[in-house]
Amino acid sequence: MKYLNQHEAISVDEELFNEYKFSVDQLMELAGLSCAHVINDCYGSPQSTVKRKVLVCCGPGNNGGDGLVAARHLKLMNFDAHVYYPKRTEKDLFINLQHQCESMGITVSKDCPTLEWVEGEFGLIVDALFGFSFKPPVRESFAPIMDVLNKSKVPIVSVDIPSGWHVEEGPQDECNIQPDCLISLTAPKLCAKKLTNAKHYLGGRFVPPKLQDKYAMELPTYEGNNLFVKLS
Amino acid sequence: MKYLNQHEAISVDEELFNEYKFSVDQLMELAGLSCAHVINDCYGSPQSTVKRKVLVCCGPGNNGGDGLVAARHLKLMNFDAHVYYPKRTEKDLFINLQHQCESMGITVSKDCPTLEWVEGEFGLIVDALFGFSFKPPVRESFAPIMDVLNKSKVPIVSVDIPSGWHVEEGPQDECNIQPDCLISLTAPKLCAKKLTNAKHYLGGRFVPPKLQDKYAMELPTYEGNNLFVKLS
């Protein structure tokens, strides 16, 4: 299986929208749903000792949108989701995704959670801050939440890219979060090779075969109705 | 569990879009995906003797859109989908759903399949012609495909409503297709009580709890990551 560089990841994304005519609504729904399924599979079993209260940290772009979708589906799967979503856009889709969360009883807050509150309250953190278009360094307004993620002992599930990591080179000196689980979407990016002791899943079962071939992705087979594949 | 009348079904749908601010893209993707999952579960096992070539009949409205989405996901699950989609709209979403199918190698045709071809070629028919807003009688342009569905021995999976049935009263004298499987979306409609010897599934795992309560739906519990529940 191929690990995409940043340029390839951006190109694949553009082709899905421009050539294959998917809407952001469609693919974000499928991506966020696959994240919720991985989380439910990994941490949601009745035997799991992980608390079902989940902090979902959503960034300003599409990675954050995946997080908002995941939060909604997690709520329907009896997780207690709390969303931190500090920097919002005026795009209808994002306003509506937030509204959908709130009308299902999910709090969507601009207040950065403290380390103490996170450690005391949550069983899991979903990191949906930055995705494959991120370039370091992290902007100052996100420094407080990155500090919480860096210091917290609560397991982190990163959506597509561990936030703050370079998409190709991985952890940076100042941003070195270590997710317990990474959910690569569409295809893994190069930084996923720098994971240590993390579960790694692939989600986003929507890539047209012709596009897989064009980028020589060699994706693994999704079994049955699964929306994800466990890679390691 | 409650079976909705036509007025309730229309109201629930309107609330999902107007109050909960879902887009058609989002809910159609989830609905169509749940249909593909039911079909894969029911007919897609390696032990199944049903041929994996599926005729997906898509009507002019949202029921047809669910069919187009299901066809695309079925293709990704190694079913060989062929779409009959005679009456198309100018809406971007539908143009794009058709394009997505075609760019995955699915033929989308306006030519009504003959009974002989259907019987010889296909292992399954997905009936996504008319949904919960249908009122009999069937328009003349759909008479040929309804005739095929009425006469064919190939198992039919109906999406939300067996096409041609009255949403509340069920089979009509002139339209009395007998699906092998019905996938009710969101909540079953009254006509589902008139099924005989059919499998019955519920899909569309996206109904906000407050909306479920408002309509006293008393939906069954979706287990694990399943996007459907088997009702009978």
UniProtKB/Swiss-Prot annotation, chains A, B:
Cofactor note: Binds 1 potassium ion per subunit.
Keyword set includes Transmembrane: no
Gene Ontology cellular component terms for the protein in this record: mitochondrion
Catalytic activity: (6R)-NADHX = (6S)-NADHX; (6R)-NADPHX = (6S)-NADPHX
Residues binding K(+), per UniProt: 63, 127, 163
Keyword tags: Isomerase, Metal-binding, NAD, NADP, Nucleotide-binding, Potassium
Start and end residues of each YjeF N-terminal domain: 9-219
The protein's Enzyme Commission number: 5.1.99.6
Top-level taxonomic group: Eukaryota
GO molecular function, one term: metal ion binding
Gene3D superfamilies: YjeF N-terminal domain
Function, in words: Catalyzes the epimerization of the S- and R-forms of NAD(P)HX, a damaged form of NAD(P)H that is a result of enzymatic or heat-dependent hydration. This is a prerequisite for the S-specific NAD(P)H-hydrate dehydratase to allow the repair of both epimers of NAD(P)HX.
Protein name per UniProt: NAD(P)H-hydrate epimerase
Biological source species: Aedes aegypti
